[in-house]
Amino acid sequence: MKLVIAEKPSVAQSLAAVIGATARKDGYLEGNGWRVSWCVGHLAGLADADSYDPKYAKWRYDDLPILPEHWQMVVGKDKKKQFDILKKLMNAPDVTEVVNACDAGREGELIFRSVYELAGCQKPMKRLWISSMEDSAIREGFANLCPGADYDGLRDAALCRAKADWLVGINATRLFSVLYHRTLNIGRVMSPTLALIVQREAEIDTFKPVPFYTVALELPGLTVSGERMADKAAAEQLKEACQGAAATIKKVECKEKSEKPPALYDLTTLQRDANRLLGFTAQQTLDYLQSLYEKKLCTYPRTDSRYLTGDMADSLPVLVNLVANAMPFRKGIAITCDPQTVINDKKVTDHHAVIPTRNLKDADLSALPAGEKAVLELVALRLLCAVAQPHIYSETVVIAACAGGEFTAKGKTVKHPGWKALEDAYRAKMKDAEPKKEGAEKALPELTEGQTLSVSAAIVKEGKSSPPQHFTEDTLLSAMETAGKDDMPEDAERKGLGTPATRAGILEKLVSAGFLERKKNRKTVQLLPSHDAVSLITVLPEQLQSPLLTAEWEYRLGEIERGQLAPEEFLDGISTMLKDLVGTYQVIKGTEYLFTPPREVVGKCPRCGGEVAELQKGFFCQNDSCKFAIWKNNKWWAAKKKQPTKAVVSALLNDGRVRVTGLYSEKTGKTYDATVVLEDDGQYANFKLEFDQRKGGSR
């Protein structure tokens, strides 16, 4: 009997159906000499700090850094049942071999190995490594199982990544939280990513636009423009000199150009396009693509390759043809297929590029959720474009002279639309399709050098230099991918911050931690740092916010994966860095109050409708332009020997009144009960008393 362990139940069912394990049991499937079970994501993970010593349950500076000598793995309480099932299956006497069928990547390897080792399993181990959930790919994968030991480097890299994240997260988070009296989540990749965003905002805030001026001349059939000028008076002078004059054509240059088709998608480029064209977050795109993979409609999602392998060349034309027939936007467009444009064995590591599968032929695409359908169409479009003919056009550049100045015009004539015909057809069907820029592909009239043309109009156009753009998920993913790239070795397989598999999760963590806000601006969603994010990057030392250092770590993890670096050497370097950080870092003078304490909202402001929150000295509207406040040392309340509590103020804001007991009377020296009513006159928050007339009110 052979045991197969998948990463999740849905994948296990697909595998079991192909190999004939169809009988349902408690936590697994069985049949045809196979048992198929599953993990539920990470069943086991690194233990919390207090597992090593109970004193670590409390965050104290004196306990740092926390550097475990012997790492512990623990099973999550909510996942113990499935772990126990796997442990029993692994150690069953009739099981002769265990097949790791978790996702074919770092995390999938770690998920399986953690369970395998915690279960104390000693059975021979094989690895199922597939890039598609199609039945044919599954059958081929089981026919070519690899020895599990071939992936020891992948396991080592995954475990080192987890330990590095633990070390930096636990120690840096505790250090800065203790020093600044606020929980500040710090991550090995998260913090440098945040630093990119904060730095961009600083560049935008300090940017000073520089005005410039260009002179444009209207000639018969075309408009020519001069170079940018810093002096407006000089531009006006040139305009006047050109007005009513004649322009001489100095140069006419026509070149035929070719624009190659785009490469296929890896995960990051797909996430970027899905954000730019569809408005999806990186996490949404990954989730949709993962579902399409499990539905056997797309290949493996977490890939960093944009090419296919040579053994796929012969079957590619058939796939391209059936994909084209399934996509409505390609109607009327001739489909070509040049496999060599997408074949490159040297640029495929663990998995090839993301492409649709042949199951598309029989799939009911209308039954797919809208998000999945949109991502599938994008993947299909890219495949059709990538194997299509180049986009060929002629570009004409005209240089004219007038009144001592030079003026230029460019024109474009499409000779063969090639792959762009598909892209244009796809975009034309989009609801928010961007209109083509007027004149962007306008052809110029026939002109000859030495020809003179009359200037019918001359104008001065004023512009300003543009500030850097706020990050979107599209542009941030690009920045993460290339961070530290120039300083990495040319042959480095992984450069940048994070990996295709982890970048979406990093962005979501930044949002959930309150460091990052998604703000819609017209058709895009900008990523903006919060006040606390700016404060955090202000106090973080360079080694925790440097994209270069983190990119270097990613490169080192790649070396571990390839067996070129010992895991201990990598982790020793991080431990040394943390010891130095704890031993030398001091609170930066003037930054003690950068981090505002969390403010609990108690109600709505009666003046502006904003949120009223409790601070140390009272309850204040959070809108900067509104001055509504209820002070805790308010004289009216002090005279009655009471202080407005959170519950009292909440009732006043929500209901306008609140019943209060034990109010003190200065006249009688006794206490009484009454209803306090809030009366706000727009300048001050006033209070009055109301008494129950039926019962009276003794003072």
Regions found by a protein language model. Give the residues of each.
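Active-site phosphate-binding and catalytic loops of NTP-dependent enzymes
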Residues: 23-28, 123, 148-153, 174-178, ...
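C-terminal or mid-to-C-terminal helical accessory/interaction module adjacent to the motor/catalytic core
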Residues: 93, 135-219, 254-258
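Basic, low-complexity terminal or inter-domain segments flanking catalytic cores
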Residues: 2-3, 79, 90, 118, ...
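Conserved short loop/turn motifs at secondary-structure junctions
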Residues: 1-3, 101-104, 181-183, 254-263, ...
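Metal- or metallocofactor-binding catalytic centers and their adjacent structured scaffolds
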Residues: 233-265, 271
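Amphipathic alpha-helical transducer elements in NTP-driven molecular machines
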Residues: 9-16, 33-36, 40, 76-87, ...
